[in-house]
């Protein structure tokens, strides 16, 4: 990948189980050979590996992917890197109005934590906090800056 030639890291979000179903072989080749950090929700990852449940998908991820953050809605998330496995609790939202953008905001918070040099569990907590913030409003763009939230959550990590 061009980014690797430039010394950069490639993160990918699977984004939609329908797309994964349609382009499974291409996604698997990309995920298993090029992607450094994989983000996926439960539906997307079970679709990618054509398995019936999250635990089976998790085993496939552990065999084929070095670094992944897998979201499970109110069940939280699981972060894997090599032999490390972190189960992250979901941050309860003030209310659930619209889940559009939850995965994107999880990834944004997680990557922010990674760039801050935080441990993986703390990165997962940042992602969960950002996801909780976005689902408590309508639309996928935060209504207010998230930096204060990130700093507050990171300070507790």
Give, region by region, the residue ranges found by the protein language model.
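A conserved, positively charged/aromatic
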Residues: 31-33
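Active-site glycine- and acidic-residue-rich loops that bind
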Residues: 17-23, 48
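Active-site beta-loop-alpha junctions enriched in small/polar residues
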Residues: 15-17, 43, 73
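A short, active-site helix/loop in glycosyltransferases that binds the activated sugar's phosphate group
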Residues: 41-50
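A short beta-strand/loop micro-motif in the catalytic core of glycosyltransferases
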Residues: 35-41
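Short beta-strand/loop segments at the ligand-binding rim of alpha/beta enzyme cores
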Residues: 6-15
